[in-house]
From Swiss-Prot:
Regulation: Transport of iron ions is inhibited by zinc ions.
Key words, A-Z: Ion transport, Iron, Iron transport, Membrane, Metal-binding, Transmembrane, Transmembrane helix, Transport, Vacuole
Positions bound to Fe cation 2: E102, E113, E116, M149
GO process annotations (BP): intracellular manganese ion homeostasis; iron ion transport
Family: Belongs to the CCC1 family.
Catalysis: reaction(s): Fe(2+)(in) = Fe(2+)(out)
Function of the molecule: Vacuolar iron transporter involved in the transfer of iron ions from the cytosol to the vacuole for intracellular iron storage. Can transport cobalt ions from the cytosol to the vacuole.
UniProt organism field: Eucalyptus grandis
Assembly: Homodimer. The dimeric interaction is mediated by both the transmembrane domains (TMDs) and the cytoplasmic metal binding domain (MBD).
Transmembrane feature ranges: 37-57, 64-84, 171-191, 195-215, 227-247
Protein's UniProt name: Vacuolar iron transporter 1
Comment, domains: The cytoplasmic metal binding domain (MBD) is located between transmembrane 2 (TM2) and transmembrane 3 (TM3).
Length: 249
């Protein structure tokens, strides 16, 4: 028998490790951060943009639009960041609660939990004579057993303890960066009616770029994503501008 292979013709442990070292899969693993950035930037670009357009439609001066816009960006960043923190914290609390319950069940009803392991493995087409040794091996390793049940029975991944704060800051910063874009023209153009035109052009360009990047990272047709994102922003700003003009008249 050749070294590094077992009797069944499968690669041995050393050969398996060598194959794994040679094959590095290019999976994208920063999904949660990207999700937070998408949430923050999309809202940051759209909400202040609509607010600025609405105030411009009401004939407010650029200074008023800028002041109101910055106030909204600050409040929005705090609100969105807090929402991200609470969502991540709730997820972590739920994981801890389910982990404790699963630990208690493994101790109290081990046979039932072992049967659940067998049922899970059977769903993947593994036969009883094949999953039997796996079930027995897991019963001898409580932590591995617990991890298996959390992931495959409940579909829960252990959350990063830093996730809540990371989510809060990522969403808040992304919101600020996105929210300042539609306000930039009002910093340099004193007449709001002229500034709003520049704001529309600048923001739509930013929405197109952001939408393309979002589609690229989420593997969701970048050009289609760019057009959809820009369209949503355009509709929001047009609605706000039109409502302001209607109220004014």
């Amino acid at each position: 028998m050749a070294d590094g292979a077992n009797d069944g013709g499968n690669p041995g442990a050393e050969e398996q490790q060598r194959l794994l070292d040679q094959h590095k899969e290019a999976h994208f693993t920063a999904g949660e951060i990207v999700r937070d950035i998408i949430i923050g930037v999309s809202d940051g670009l759209t909400v202040p943009f609509a607010l600025a357009a609405g105030l411009s439609g009401a004939n407010a001066s650029s200074s008023i639009v800028l002041t109101a816009g910055i106030a909204e960006v600050a409040a929005g960043a705090i609100s969105m960041g807090l929402g991200g923190y609470l969502a991540a914290k709730s997820e972590a609390d739920n994981y801890a609660r389910e982990l404790k319950r699963e630990q208690e069940e493994i101790i109290r009803v081990p046979d039932t939990e072992a049967a659940e392991v067998a049922e899970i493995l059977a769903r993947y087409g593994i036969e009883p004579h094949e999953y039997g040794p796996v079930v027995n091996a897991l019963r001898k390793k409580p932590q591995a057993w617990l991890d298996f049940m959390m992931k495959f029975e409940l579909g829960l991944e252990k959350p990063d303890p830093k996730r809540a704060l990371q989510s809060a800051f990522t969403i808040a910063i992304a919101y600020v960066l996105g929210g300042l874009v539609p306000l930039i023209p009002y910093m340099f153009i004193p007449v709001a009616r002229k500034a709003v035109v520049a704001s529309v052009i600048l923001t739509l360009m930013a929405l197109l770029i952001f939408g393309y990047a979002k589609g690229y990272f989420t593997d969701n047709k970048p050009f289609k994503s760019a057009l959809q994102t820009a369209l949503i922003g355009a509709i929001a700003s047009a609605a706000a501008f039109g409502m302001a003009k209607a109220v004014q008249s």
